[in-house]
Amino acid sequence: MNSLPEDLLAMILVKLPIKIFTTFKIVCTQWESMVDSPYFRDLFLSIHQNSHYSSWSILSRCDEEVIAHYGCNTWGLQRSLHFYISSFLTKKFETQRNNYKVWSYSTDVGMILISENCICVKNRSLYVANPVSQECVEIPSHGYLKKVSCPLGIATRTENGVLLDYKVVLFNGSDTFRRLLIYSSQTGMWSINTVDLTVSGFHNQSPISLHGSIHWIASTSHSEDVAVSFDLYATGTSSVQCRVTTFPDFGKHPKFTRSFSTCQGSLMYMNIISITKVDGSLEIISARLYWFLKEKNGRKVLPQCQPTPLS
C-alpha cells in the first residue's frame, strides 16, 4: 500500500474505526505523519459526522443514561459515554462519589465539568475532566470572591482539534443569570461579568458547550421556554455576548419536553408537534420536525431557527 498516492491512502484509512487506523502509525513514519495530520482529522470528521449524532448532549443531569452512544466503534470507544463518565466519577471520588455530579458537557473536545450536588455554594469544588482519557484538573478556588454560585457550563476554544483554552462559567445564585463568575485557563484567574438577561431556571438537561458558546434552555417570567446562548469567545470584545431565542414551535404544545442535541457541528432541536393545514380543515398529528441553530455573519450565535420535516 506504500505505492498508493497519499490522498487515496487517506481515503481508505479514514473509513476505518479510530482504534484500527491509529495502530497503522507504527507501520512507517509516512503513515504516522498522515494519520496525525490536520488534513486527515478533518477528512475523518467530514465523512463520519453526517451519519453519527453526538451523545454527549443527550445525557441529562440524572444518573440514568438517556441514549447509548451510536457508533462507539467508529469513534474508538469500547463502551457508552455514560459508562466512561460513571466509572470516572467512582474512581475519582470513591466513597464521596454521590456528592458530585456532572454539570455540563463540552461536545467539542469531550470534556465535562464536575462539582458538588448542591445548587448554590459559596466556595464549591470544580473539576474539568476527560472521562475517556481519565485526565482531570481541579479549578482554583473562587472563595475570595465571596459569591454564592451555581455551575453553568464550560466553553472551549480549539484549533485543528487541539484544545487551546477553556472557560468555566458559574452564575451568582442570588442574581440568577445577571452576574457570571468566569474562570479562564489562559490567565488562571476568576473574573466577574454582568449580562443583561432576565430568564430563570434550567430544564432537566445540562447546558451544552459548542464552538466556544454555552447553550441551555431557560424559562421567561411568563413560563415560556427559550434558548439562551453565551458566547465566551466573541471576537473584538472582552464581554460575554448573550442571545435569547424563542423556539420555532412557540405557542404549540410539543409532545416531548424540549431539549437540545448536536449534529454535524450545529445545535439541533427536534420535537413532535401538531400542525393545522392552511385551510384549517385537517390537523396532522405527530408531524416530526427538527431545526438547526446556524451561524450568522460568521459568528456562532443563535439566529431564528428554520424548520425542516424529517423524512
Curated annotation (Swiss-Prot):
Coiled-coil parts of chain: none
Organism the protein comes from: Arabidopsis thaliana
Transmembrane segments: none
Protein name: Putative F-box protein At3g28280
UniProt domain F-box: residue ranges: 1-43
PROSITE patterns xref list: FBOX (PS50181)
Alphabetical list of PANTHER family matching this protein: BNACNNG10540D PROTEIN (PTHR31672)
InterPro entries according to UniProt: At3g26010-like_b-prop, F-box-like_dom_sf, F-box_dom, SCF_F-box_component
